Amino acid sequence: MSSVKLFKDLLGNTETVELKNKKLFISDKKINHQEIFNSVLVEEANSRQSTASTLTKAEVRGGGRKPYKQKHTGRARQGSIRNPHYVGGGRAFGPSPEKNYTLKQNSKAYKLAFQSAMTLKLNEQGLNLLVNKIDMKEPSTKTISKMLKKVSYENKKVLFVINDKNENFLKSCKNIQKVTSKMWNQVSVRDILNSDIAVIQEDAFDKISEVFA
């Protein structure tokens, strides 16, 4: 399946075209679900903020003196009322804001994951193209909404990938639920998988193919 829907304008006029640039796609046998999983895991881990924090027994206020003498009380020996087993005591092995959740994935593995995700999107007929020339003199949410409604995409998660930083187009997509717009060099495997439909500008598609093929 190498034919895709091409948006000829922002009015929702489309035609079916044959993909000329196919070097980004791989055979079904080479699709690697494990690398797709790894790339999403890495992206989510790297976006995680280390904000959870607790106090250890050294940081909790109070408990400097020994609660009672060492011997001859019939009780277990204690050194501080701020030990972890006391109410109000410090936390043993608690979360720290210094913890680093960063993960890495080598570029070759990420390329395979990206190719696999794009191939899956093409196979499920979720890949569309958009002409390079976008005439938007001002932001217009209504224009994008009408376009999506005309092709029955209004209830689907749509990802627009554009070639140049067209502020009017990016702002037009912001207020529409389930619609995301990104520059070609910002799109990730997670973005592709998280969308039902990916609409990519022709030049953006060529640039993505150069980088990830």
Swiss-Prot record:
GO MF term set: rRNA binding; structural constituent of ribosome
GO process terms (BP): translation
Gene3D superfamilies: 3.40.1370.10
Ranges annotated as biased composition (Basic residues): 63-75
GO cellular component terms attached to this protein's record: ribonucleoprotein complex; ribosome
Keywords in alphabetical order: Ribonucleoprotein, Ribosomal protein, RNA-binding, rRNA-binding
Top-level lineage group: Bacteria
Region (Disordered): 51-90
Pfam family, one: Ribosomal_L4
Record bears the keyword Protein biosynthesis: no
PANTHER family cross-referenced by the UniProt entry: 50S RIBOSOMAL PROTEIN L4, LARGE RIBOSOMAL SUBUNIT PROTEIN UL4M
Function: One of the primary rRNA binding proteins, this protein initially binds near the 5'-end of the 23S rRNA. It is important during the early stages of 50S assembly. It makes multiple contacts with different domains of the 23S rRNA in the assembled 50S subunit and ribosome. Forms part of the polypeptide exit tunnel.
Entries under HAMAP family matching the protein: Ribosomal_uL4_B (MF_01328_B)
Family of this protein: Belongs to the universal ribosomal protein uL4 family.
Subunit (UniProt): Part of the 50S ribosomal subunit.
Official protein name in the record: Large ribosomal subunit protein uL4
Primary gene name: rplD
